[in-house]
Amino acid sequence: MSKAIIAKKEKLVDDFAAELKEAKAILVIDYLGLTVEEVTNLRKDLRDANVKMKVIKNTYLKRAAEKAGIEGLEDTFVGPTAVVYTADAEDITEPARIVSKYEDDIDALSIKGGMLEGKVASQEEIKKLAAIPGREGLLSMLVSVLQAPVRNFAYAVKAVADSKDE
């Protein structure tokens, strides 16, 4: 193999290691059996959420993970593997939510494992995380809970005012 090809592969591994090092959430998925249309739709939804998906050879992935200091995911780097990751600390649940939605709809897609904020997460933990509403949903729930007493008081005052009018 020529030195130029080796240098190109080393650069690919180094670049991917840098991206993995910055990632707050990493999911390793098996995409075998997905149609081109399904992969395209998945990538589009991930891109819209500021999440990246990369299909990379397992040997390169192992080297990149090693360089990034990621341990505990090596057993997931088997067979057809894609890595879904985000460096966005705003909502680390978003990749899990999107991939889990596709996993429910498409039998061919499966989550192998992942890492969330530096901690290895099993397939079950990722599915539980995906069930939690996103930041927007949680904020709207909080606002609703905070508004409830004020709203109930306003209804009570209105009911008293209506009863006095009659």
UniProtKB/Swiss-Prot annotation:
Keywords, comma-separated and alphabetical: Ribonucleoprotein, Ribosomal protein, RNA-binding, rRNA-binding
Listed CDD domains: Ribosomal_L10
Signal peptide residues on this chain, from the entry's feature table: none
Molecular function (Gene Ontology), one example: structural constituent of ribosome
PANTHER family: 39S RIBOSOMAL PROTEIN L10, MITOCHONDRIAL (PTHR11560)
Subunit-structure text: Part of the ribosomal stalk of the 50S ribosomal subunit. The N-terminus interacts with L11 and the large rRNA to form the base of the stalk. The C-terminus forms an elongated spine to which L12 dimers bind in a sequential fashion forming a multimeric L10(L12)X complex.
HAMAP family: Ribosomal_uL10
Protein name according to UniProt: Large ribosomal subunit protein uL10
Species annotation: Lactobacillus johnsonii (strain CNCM I-12250 / La1 / NCC 533)
